Structures are given as structure tokens and as C-alpha cells.
Amino acid sequence: MGSFSIWHWLIVLLIVVMVFGTKKLKNIGSDLGGAVKGFKDGMKDGASTDDSATTSAPAGQVTNNSTAADKTTIDVEAKHKS
């Protein structure tokens, strides 16, 4: 009595299909699959870039690499309304 039987789950599935439709459920499934694939690819890329970052600069050492973006940065002051 604590868990649902197979018949309860089939009725819930039937109601969900009737409410959302099969096309919308298919789109949700493909979106979820794409998100999981993107997450896995991101984890693989993150692990490989983390390994290369630790070998290039020792921990605790700060490097200053000036780029073209540093030359175009404008320093401004924010004015607060009172």
C-alpha cells in the first residue's frame, strides 16, 4: 500500500499523454537528452582544460596576460541618486 502498483503508473502515464500530447512529450525528451549530452561534453572539456591549466601555471602564482580588451577598457565612476 506504500508504493503504487503498475496500474497506477499506467493510469498516470495515460493522463500525462492525454494532457500534453505525444508531440510535446517527444520534444521534452529530446531537449532533456540534448541537455544531458551537453553537460557530459562540458564535463569532458572542463576536465581537459583544468589539467592543462594546472600544468601551465603553478598554484598560487598569478600571471598577468595583457590583451587587447585591457586597452579598450574605460574606467568610470558610478553616481548614486540620493
Swiss-Prot record:
Transit peptide recorded as keyword: no
Gene3D superfamilies cross-referenced by the UniProt entry: 1.20.5.3310
Pfam families associated with the record: TatA_B_E (PF02416)
Biological processes annotated in GO: protein transport by the Tat complex
GO MF terms held by the record: protein transmembrane transporter activity
GO cellular component: TAT protein transport complex
Membrane topology, record value: Single-pass membrane protein
Domain of life, source organism: Bacteria
Compartment(s) of residence: Cell inner membrane
Biased amino acid composition, Basic and acidic residues: 72-82
Keyword Transmembrane (UniProt): yes
Chain residue ranges for the region called Disordered: 46-82
Keyword annotations of the record: Cell inner membrane, Cell membrane, Membrane, Protein transport, Translocation, Transmembrane, Transmembrane helix, Transport
TM annotation in the entry: 1-21
Function: Part of the twin-arginine translocation (Tat) system that transports large folded proteins containing a characteristic twin-arginine motif in their signal peptide across membranes. TatA could form the protein-conducting channel of the Tat system.
Family, as annotated: Belongs to the TatA/E family.
Protein name: Sec-independent protein translocase protein TatA
Lineage: Bacteria, Pseudomonadati, Pseudomonadota, Betaproteobacteria, Burkholderiales
